[in-house]
Amino acid sequence: MFSKQDQIQGYDDALLSAMNAEEQRQEDHIELIASENYTSKRVMQAQGSGLTNKYAEGYPGKRYYGGCEHVDKVEQLAIERARQLFGADYANVQPHSGSQANAAVYLALLQAGDTVLGMSLAHGGHLTHGAKVSFSGKLYNAVQYGIDTTTGLIDYDEVERIAVECQPKMLIAGFSAYSKTLDFPRFRAIADKVGAYLFVDMAHVAGLVAAGLYPNPLPYADVVTTTTHKTLRGPRGGLILAKANEELEKKFNSAVFPGGQGGPLMHVIAAKAVCFKEAMEPGFKTYQQQVIDNAQAMAQVFITRGFDVVSGGTDNHLFLVSLIRQGLTGKEADAALGRAHITVNKNSVPNDPQSPFVTSGLRIGTPAVTTRGFKVTQCIELAGWICDILDNLGAADVEANVASQVAALCADFPVYR
């Protein structure tokens, strides 16, 4: 029998030590990985609730197990809030991750071997958009488009040319490292020209979309997926959205369960419901505007300091810095910044001469630092510190000086007050 007083402390101190160390790292380090953010304690409360005990295969009102009357209400709340937040007619809140939401879309709309056209991972796309190492590149005939390496922008005429040539059954719009605004009407027109489904993966910009600061793909796409973390600032999970279409809705539901998953994670669905409610608060738009302002301010510092920012700047929460001209690798830059307690991720850039394990770029994002309360002033200062380290790569004194300034800034802006 379990006790309500059970604690990890004193029972599994080795595990607790690692957990506490990670929480301390989050407080003491500046987080600039574009896909990371901090959730509210409300989201954490939902994830740590007794809902984790309940199996609930199926959908609200159509479960395969009994005792689901309360979790049905939880899931229905999440569904209704997701629909309201994004202006969708349909929402499936069960996918465990963005990749599983994407896999469900493939399963619902395609047959193995069908042709899909998505953005190349090397040019800012995502693994699930047709990369050879992903299920999307193994089970389907994946054709890739990229950016114009001169402008750093998607060349929609070229996307259309490739689409006409390969006749995809599904056209994918979305990215993991593209800093400009996607033209959803143009993607729709290209999809219509070749008779393809248009699938939009808005995982990185869902929070901006919810705040009305980035175009909403729902009016144009046959289906939209997103994660619920990143800019949306919720738990790690996935979400599928669409306009009203009874036939497609049934396909999406079946592709999630039983097609790709068993029982949903009800504690995570509850946390999604919390984050959707938080995203409807007036302050959420203010936060998202600050995310954009901070990213644009940081990108400008890099440009001023002589670094190449892919696409020439940013319209959203992230930007990609090419280190090719400086003769540096993303791997060594990532490590040097880590020693100064600044966390970024190495990232491939277009026409990267290095392997994906080394790379020639850094991806930088501002959702997490903005959650801490950083404004443009702090982000300009932070970008300058990063440039100092990159200009003096391996200089221990520079790293130590930056680390001390990082410590002071983190103390002034704790993650949780």
UniProtKB/Swiss-Prot annotation:
Cofactor: pyridoxal 5'-phosphate
N6-(pyridoxal phosphate)lysine, modified sites: K230
Primary residence: cytoplasm
Binding-site positions, (6S)-5,6,7,8-tetrahydrofolate: L121, G125, H126, L127, S355, P356, F357
GO BP terms in the entry: glycine biosynthetic process from serine; tetrahydrofolate interconversion
Single GO term (MF): pyridoxal phosphate binding
Gene3D superfamilies named in the record: Aspartate Aminotransferase, domain 1 (3.90.1150.10), Type I PLP-dependent aspartate aminotransferase-like (Major domain) (3.40.640.10)
InterPro entries the record matches: PyrdxlP-dep_Trfase (IPR015424), PyrdxlP-dep_Trfase_major (IPR015421), PyrdxlP-dep_Trfase_small (IPR015422), Ser_HO-MeTrfase (IPR001085), Ser_HO-MeTrfase-like (IPR049943), Ser_HO-MeTrfase_PLP_BS (IPR019798), SHMT-like_dom (IPR039429)
Location of this chain's protein in the cell: Cytoplasm
Cited HAMAP family: SHMT
The protein, known as: Serine hydroxymethyltransferase 1
Organism encoding this protein: Pseudomonas syringae pv. tomato (strain ATCC BAA-871 / DC3000)
